[in-house]
Amino acid sequence: MNLKSLANPSVYFSLTLAILAFGLDRAHKAFQVSAECIAIGAAPCVEVFTSYVPFAMTDWRGGEVVRVTDFFDYVLVWNTGISYGLFDSLPVWSLGVVTAVAILALAIWWVRADSALIRMGLALCIGGALSNALDRLLYGGVADFFHLHWGTWSFYIFNVADVAITAGVILLLADLIGLGRPQKAPV
């Protein structure tokens, strides 16, 4: 990135997206994750939540399912792996290293990107990944809340950061297929 590219509005817009993705997820988790768990710090809050731990500012306790609609439930699940619970048997530090390397690679890609769509997609991915990484560092797992299902079909349980990451990937795929790029005139 050079000084000329700093004048590009997509740089500031994408930074705003990253901050929003991170901030909205942190705010949601601050409202829902117990103050007792936060006070524990690096202790494995995953184990704490298997017993009774009241949530800050609500009567809701993790683990119980709150049916919102016929296809949407609200529940706290601690994901000790990465997406879809993959690699949940690996130690937290190794997942932290993988996450840090991924975030660094995305940041380098963001700096070198010349497309607004790529910058926005990467920013959403980085903001969401940073928030989930902070969960892993603080609690030993990532707090997930939203569960979509229909009949016997069940989607994985996710959080606001996961929504940001998914939206970021969709923007990257849109750029890959050419959306948002100026069309070349036929010769």
Predicted regions and their residues:
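Alpha-helical transmembrane bundles and membrane-interface segments of multipass inner-membrane proteins
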Residues: 1-187
